[in-house]
From Swiss-Prot:
Belongs to the glyceraldehyde-3-phosphate dehydrogenase family. This is Glyceraldehyde-3-phosphate dehydrogenase. Residues 169-188 are annotated as: Disordered. It comes from the Bacteria. Homotetramer. The gene is gap. InterPro entries: GlycerAld/Erythrose_P_DH, GlycerAld_3-P_DH_AS, GlycerAld_3-P_DH_cat, GlycerAld_3-P_DH_NAD(P)-bd, Glyceraldehyde-3-P_DH_1, NAD(P)-bd_dom_sf. It is found in: Cytoplasm. Its EC number is 1.2.1.12. Keywords: Cytoplasm, Glycolysis, NAD, Nucleotide-binding, Oxidoreductase. SMART domains: Gp_dh_N. GO terms for biological process: glucose metabolic process; glycolytic process. GO terms for cellular component: cytoplasm.
């Protein structure tokens, strides 16, 4: 997904990929995707490397990032997407190998700072290793920031209705740490834990200790929903909340936050480039201080 997204931008050039897959299989997986469809471009393999749209991309299969010799291909930024090297100590091996900066595609497991578009990008101070947090945090944080900035959040609970992920089982299987997580993904709605809401407190310090949440894993291949239920400091009608969200989507958070009033469903957002989309028709207010937002 990172690779496909990069192909849509003229200011990013992929020069190298490290994966334990061989180049032929890597090319196959790039060409064909059950969720996102065929790759819009040419893909071939030459001398053990990928050639995409005529550009050669170095392919390696190193288990230790310190051996990757990123300096040989002029790497500026590494997208660390294995889910394994999520601390400063382990991710710094990419710096040792010659990269200038590293972006972790999941939440860091130590004090490595997390930055989320629409929440705290303005706080970035040139750190060489950062985390982009989780997909759920990226969806929740812009929404929570708009609400907190305009009305104040006293406290809140989040539920994410989350699409199936690769870590789940196709049929029931052993899962010693998470028994429910071992049940068949296509057969069940599976309650699960998530640190996404608490992570919002790391990127928006004013919300630290005010949010927590849980997840339901559901049998859909892509697109997830965040349901945020909050108690507001400043009373607001649902129409006032909608206006604040629309103003942000068209103003300060344009390109990050979306606003929709159509009768949409999850597949309408397959391939969505915005971080978060507020569904104006899906939310509901109990009163002017207690609301559910989607």
């Amino acid at each position: 997904i990172v690779f496909r997204a990069a192909q849509e931008r003229s200011d990013i050039e992929i020069v190298a990929i490290n994966d334990l897959l061989d180049a032929e299989y890597m090319a196959y997986m790039l060409k064909y995707d059950s969720t996102h469809g065929r790759f819009n471009g040419t893909v071939e393999v030459k001398d053990g490397h990928l050639v995409v749209n005529g550009k050669t991309i170095r392919v390696t299969a190193e288990k230790d990032p310190a051996n990757l010799k990123w300096n040989e291909v002029g790497v500026d930024v590494v997208a660390e997407a294995t889910g394994i090297f999520l601390t400063d100590e382990t991710a710094r091996k990419h710096i040792t190998a010659g990269a200038k900066k590293v972006v972790l595609t999941g939440p860091s497991k130590d004090a490595t700072p997390m930055f989320v578009r629409g929440a705290n990008f303005d706080k970035y101070a040139g750190q060489d290793i950062v985390s982009n947090a989780s997909c759920t945090t990226n969806c929740l944080a812009p929404l929570a920031k708009v609400i907190n900035d305009n009305f104040g959040i006293v406290e809140g609970l989040m539920t994410t209705v989350h699409a199936t992920t690769a870590t789940q089982k196709t049929v029931d299987g052993p899962s010693h740490k998470d028994w429910r997580g071992g049940r068949g993904a296509s057969q069940n709605i599976i309650p699960s834990s998530t640190g996404a809401a608490k992570a919002v407190g790391k990127v928006i310090p004013e919300l630290k200790g005010k949010l927590t949440g849980m997840a339901f894993r559901v049998p859909t291949p892509n697109v997830s929903v965040v349901d945020l239920t909050v108690r507001l400091e400043k009373p607001a009608t649902y129409e006032e909340i909608k206006k604040a969200m629309k103003d942000a989507a068209e103003g300060s958070m344009k390109g990050v936050l979306g606003y929709v009033e159509d009768d949409v469903v999850s597949t309408d957002f397959n391939g969505e480039v915005l971080t978060s989309v507020f569904d104006a028709k899906a939310g509901i207010a109990l009163n002017d201080n207690f609301v559910k937002l989607v």
